[in-house]
Amino acid sequence: MQCALYDAGRCRSCQWITQSVNEQLSAKTADLHRLLAGLPVEQWCAPIGGPEQHFRNKAKMVVSGSVEKPLFGMLHRDGTPVDLCGCPLYPASFAPVFSALKPFIARAGLTPYNVARKRGELKYLLLTESQFDGGMMLRFVLRSETKLTQLRAALPWLRAQLPQLRVITANIQPVHMAIMEGETEIYLTDQQALVERFNDVPLWIRPQSFFQTNPTVASRLYATARDWVGQLPVRHMWDLFCGVGGFGLHCATPQMQLTGIEIAPEAIACAKQSAAELGLTRLHFQALDSTQFAIAQGETPDLVLVNPPRRGIGKPLCDYLAQMAPRFIIYSSCNAQTMAQDIRHLPNYRIQRVQLFDMFPHTAHYEVLALLRRSI
């Protein structure tokens, strides 16, 4: 992939950009083999790749510069701003949004936050697009509610310029730290969620719910999990760290009993909405801590699917799963190192199959899906 920002030495986020996609995939596959060394794997499935550019459905932009000439992108450690509007990871549909937002910021009087001086209001712009219908969600991350009245007054102009903006919010992040969002979310539109659709499964995206940033590869990840579960004798399943329910909603059947657990209430609201649309009455989603939920249960499902953050599921949950001994475990991970550590804490399980998904091209990161079967 050619990138003018990289060539000019202004951005180094895509550290592997000089390697071909095939070289990157080979290196990631070798890394996964290294991490799983000593753990018998019955079947290595072929790795799954995707587009090398224009694949991201989300932009996270630091806002700097002045109210008359705002700049969207990132700040180097020395405070130097870099404009990332031309980043080739973003789809072409983002460019007109960035172009319209620059004069809008002046109209609304949203002074960019100055980190060194601790002054200003607008810290970040967070833009998300639905691949399904092109609808977009825009979040203004502000230091306070001081400019809310001006922001509301200027919105009709912005919405006339960009009718694809379906969900607009103001997120309040008052802390002087590099934290992307705060707890308070103020909706500025009637619509509060974007609809996405993977493999004919409706998925909803709300402001504070996690959603994969590479929809092409994510849809294949979910479809693969559905295929694997469909080949197993599963009548009762847990989906832990379930997010908006992508895995559970793909794997569930009308006859299956499924419980999805996620600590973020916004994500659970999305999952419940999708389950209702699909008419799946035996799916139950709850906003709880996944480890605490599992340890408190007295029943054993046929299969437990886990999709934890980068830190993995941790030894307490591993120990409980080993004790509870479901017949199958599916582990989806964005950090194969912690996944390998966790699997080593499950000595009575064997890896039946594993597959790599190149969710993050031009970086060392990747997603991996592993099916574990109880051996005794």
Swiss-Prot record:
Q: Which organism is it from?
A: Salmonella paratyphi B (strain ATCC BAA-1250 / SPB7)
Q: From which domain of life does this come?
A: Bacteria
Traced from the root, the source organism's taxonomic lineage reads: Bacteria, Pseudomonadati, Pseudomonadota, Gammaproteobacteria, Enterobacterales
Q: What is this protein called?
A: 23S rRNA (uracil(747)-C(5))-methyltransferase RlmC
Entries under Gene3D superfamilies matching the protein: 2.40.50.1070, Vaccinia Virus protein VP39
Which positions in this protein are listed as binding S-adenosyl-L-methionine?
212, 241, 262, 307
**PROSITE patterns listed in its UniProt record:** SAM_MT_RNA_M5U, TRMA_1, TRMA_2
Q: Which UniProt keywords apply?
A: 4Fe-4S, Iron, Iron-sulfur, Metal-binding, Methyltransferase, rRNA processing, S-adenosyl-L-methionine, Transferase
Xref: Pfam families: tRNA_U5-meth_tr
From its record, what is one biological process in GO terms? rRNA base methylation
